[in-house]
Amino acid sequence: TIGSIIGTFVPTFVTIPAFGTSVTFLVFAGILLLLALIYFISAKKRCVSLVSGIVLFVLCCFGGFSDSFAFWETNLLYEGESVYNYLQVKEDKENVILSTNVLFGVQSVLKKDAGLSGMYYDYMLAAPVLAGAQEKEKTDVLVLGNGTGTFAAQCRKFFSRSQVEGVEIDEKITALAKDYFQMPDDVKVTTYDGRAYLNAIDKTYDVILVDAFQDITIPFQMSSVEFFRLVKSHLKEDGVMAVNLNMRGDGGGSINEYLSDTIGAV
């Protein structure tokens, strides 16, 4: 029980935020080896496996340790970790791409030709149109799950009178947005949980994009009827909510179906 508690909370709140995942593995491997060493010495037993483990641990610490996970990548601009994510920024001839916790996925993209992204962000641009952005002097847009600001930048480009705010829980991703993705300086980004942010403000918006769902990783607090009611309360009378589910599954009983039913109940 004690080991389970330590193994759950110490990596989450101490070692991973302070040192990263690789060092965390080595720290806990060292602790296990130390406990094994104490046992075999106190029991006056000899164990070839323990000695081999110690040798292997030392070799990993001084010879095989690397901060880079994607050692095969040749086009990385940045690789690192945050409290929430493993982060990669890659560049090719046409794009700068952010990937989190995956080898091949794309969470944010910057097109070097300043055109459309070719991804779901382009479809989301229908939301300001439906909200009447062309006829309004100012269109207030809120992005919950701002990432590196792909949608925010597109709103500023194609709807010049839009005023965009972003909420992003991972402050390292926001830093990458400024360093590599040319996020507009006039996009205000708050480091906070999306639902908690809505609870803390009174402002209403023409468009709210909920972009916090990543594959099967769904913030439970942002997938309930109560959450979508909260979003609705922050929309203007003719406001539009857009949601990126980013998950496959068209059959009955899929998570998409359940979330659609939840939204439809509001």
Go through each PLM region and give its residues.
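Small-residue-mediated transmembrane helix hinge/kink sites in multi-pass secondary transporters
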Residues: T12-I16
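A short glycine-rich, Lys/Arg-flanked "PGG" loop and its adjoining helix->strand segment in the class I
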Residues: S223-E237
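Class I S-adenosylmethionine
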Residues: L56-E165, D170-F181, S254, L259
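Hydrophobic/small/kink-forming positions within alpha-helical transmembrane segments
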Residues: I5-F9, L33
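A short acidic, Gly/Pro-enriched loop at the edge of an enzyme's catalytic core
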Residues: N199-L209
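Membrane-interfacial entry segments at the cytosolic side of transmembrane helices
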Residues: S42-V55
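Conserved SAM-binding strand-loop segment of SAM-dependent methyltransferases
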Residues: M183-G194
